Amino acid sequence: MFAGRGAWRRSEINLVKGSAKAQKGMIEMELMEAIKGRRSVRKFKPDPIPKEDLEEIIQAGLCAPSAQNLQPWYFVALTKKEDLSYLFSELGTTAFSHRKELEARFKNNPEVVEETMEFMSAMGGSQTIILGFLNKPDYSDELLPSCIESVAAAMENMCLAAYDKGIASCWVEAVVRAGNALGSHFATGHGKLIGAIVLGYADMEPRPIKQKGARYVIR
């Protein structure tokens, strides 16, 4: 677990005695533990997330960098049963096309297809799902890619802040298939749906990450 509850905020960092270099090293170690320790979890306990923890997780997202400081995000945290039921119902309408995509992508791993479809039917029992939208529907073609990246950066912040609190997460892109319906229902007047973060207390041991090779170069 990310050492130090809320360690991303300077005021709550438990600074060790010693030089400024030692203090800096401790902060960096905690941050790297969070980055490397976070995993996607797809099965959750029924325990609700305290409202104050959810607020802090969202606030962490709002601290993310954004293109031209536009802060082009709008987040909707679903916690009510009727809202979650609506989400699951809309995702059900896209299940067939989603399965076809997964079968093409994982043709040698059919178990992955089945596991994913089972997860998508009820998001692993999560009681809290954050939908990430663009704040406006009319960003220019030049700005749009950067605005999408900005929302993604905020969502990553939320995943790390959740991990800091012992709360598991899973970034889900499949919700965009039902983006029009979800946007009309939950975010009228705002922009397109970029993705979702599923939150909860883990009820499974996540798989280790298998990193693909040759994905960067230092010159």
Q: Predicted segment positions?
A:
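Short, Lys/Arg-enriched N-terminal segments with co-localized hydrophobic residues
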Residues: 9-28
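Short acidic N-proximal helix/loop "leader" segments that mark the beginning
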Residues: 26-48, 52-56
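C-terminal helix-cap and adjacent tail motif
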Residues: 33-41, 117, 193-219
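Small-aliphatic-rich amphipathic alpha-helix that forms the alpha element of a beta-alpha
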Residues: 56-57, 61, 128-130, 136-184
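Glycine-rich phosphate/pyrophosphate-binding beta-alpha loops
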Residues: 65-69
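Glycine/small-residue-rich phosphate/adenosyl-binding loop
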Residues: 77-150
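Short, electropositive alpha-helical surface patch
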Residues: 182-195
